[in-house]
């Protein structure tokens, strides 16, 4: 069972929290109906001050203080309800050390919409790709210049860090997480229940092939991103690596060390999994 820590920050957006809870509750319900052990333990995370004030608001969920010894497998940061993000971040500074501590302990972190501002405030997104609500992307980029902001992305996944854009992008990221923790079949079923358009993904997330982004080799990461972005037009791996500051042999060795496979096989897997995603999407549409 995976421990989910859903932060309820100051100025949180209720619809964002409701969507997160609804999806993960539905996953657990599906497992319960099939007499299977529940895969997810949903925990509400708040400050001691908030717990005293909102003691009955999240009835039915364990409410855990940031001062407890709780350890999450994944921390979830919902969207904010206000446009005054500077003031909101000031209110939520208390959460930053807790998020950092959870990450150091091995947790994954996922933010939804403008929740990316709190995530980025921890410094954990520095040097990583991230997205947020399109209307807030310029402010986000200027506030956190070390973050590689991708405003056109619905979802980003970089190592143990995940972000989503605004509105229905929340569901796109939730589906990714369901797939990661519960598998393709459950993820596709959840997508059908919530009428989520899988075709909005910019990468093949529904995959038995799971690329490794947790390494620290920038050159390998650069090749991975090039393959995933331009896999249709790539004819040979030599065309990708010709301008890189290392020999072909060295690059292939490093790439295989970090990803487990050589670049050409990585390219083939990306193409296969993209085709798989398109087929799964076609099947969902035909069953509607």
Regions found by a protein language model. Give the residues of each.
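N-terminal functional module of multi-domain proteins
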Residues: 2-120
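Short active-site oxyanion
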Residues: 104-109, 124-129, 160
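A conserved active-site-flanking secondary-structure segment within enzyme catalytic domains
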Residues: 126-153
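Conserved anion/nucleotide-ligand pocket segment
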Residues: 152-153, 157-193
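Basic, amphipathic alpha-helical hairpins
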Residues: 179-183, 220-236, 255, 259, ...
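Accessory alpha-helical/coil subdomains and C-terminal extensions
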Residues: 181-225, 233
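Basic/polar phosphate-binding segments, predominantly the helix-turn-helix DNA-binding elements
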Residues: 226-228, 234, 238-273
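Hydrophobic positions on the alpha-helical face of helix-turn-helix-like DNA-binding modules
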Residues: 240, 286-288
